[in-house]
Amino acid sequence: MTDPILRRPILLGGLGLLLMRRGEAAVPVDGTLRGVLERVYIGWSEAMRRGDLTGFSRHTSRYRQMCLRNEVVSLRQPWPRAVFRGIVQAPPLQGLTCVDAAEHGDTARLAYFGRVDFGLDAAGVENPVVLRFLREADGWKFDWIQYVNLGRDEAARQALRRGERKWLESPQFRLTGEYPEVPKPCREPYQVAGLSVVALGCRVTVELNGGVHRETVENDTGGRVITGGLRKGVNSVAIQPEVLAGASDVRLQVAVLTRQGKAAKELWKWSPSEPAGQWKPRYDTTIFVKSAAVVR
């Protein structure tokens, strides 16, 4: 399954465009908020390390617990035991430099810079990592991790060593202030499947089976396990594409994949027949599952 600790890594090769001018003073980190959020994260990471379901439930947001539950069930894995089987470990905060602690409404974040160790091998080059939190009735809860790969952008690393945080103003790191709607629990799928999306120069929202699974990708590639998988018979698909302003090289493809042994098998693929400037605001189609891994 997708690891419960880490969402899809973010690649920010152009982060240097957002950096402040050399010599500009960094704003001090909110020490009080940092302390509160770090205690939540440490409690969560300890629960993950021990396989402690009670501790995991206490420190994890209700929203994330339901997202993970649906993902595990959609893979036909045992809930909640499968949550503790991920090979990625919660990175320790020791040795990392905290560059930001912020809250807005019911959302909060901690941002760090350094050699982030997920336990896969020796920590490599320095990169940023952002910890996300949601506020509930009894306090802050851990939600998810954003890991940022700077690639070869050494100018960005130099600025981050000085405490730069301008990059946190980009859309993928902003705090919405709102607690997300907790999804409804899904049922075990007839066919386990994943969605693969290529949306370059455009933004697309894909919904399956009336919104049981909903995913938006903007100027990127994406995809994850389909919530509830595919049903036997007709599966509805709604695709809402939009070309981004100023985009010249536009590509859109949506595919549904499953796994046969160690190899991925493409069950279904769609692209708009019209050129990018003539796309409809919405396309409705279907995937018909005749039997497991047999689609027409």
Q: What does each model-found stretch correspond to?
A:
Residues 2-3, 8-25, 215-218:
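N-terminal export signals
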Residues 32-35, 42-49, 61-62, 117-126, ...:
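Beta-strand-rich recognition domains
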Residues 44, 55-56, 110, 133:
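Hydrophobic pocket/interface hotspot
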Residues 50-77:
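Short, well-ordered alpha-helical segments enriched in acidic and aromatic residues
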Residues 203-211, 215:
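Periplasmic plug
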Residues 222-228:
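Exposed aromatic-hydrophobic patches
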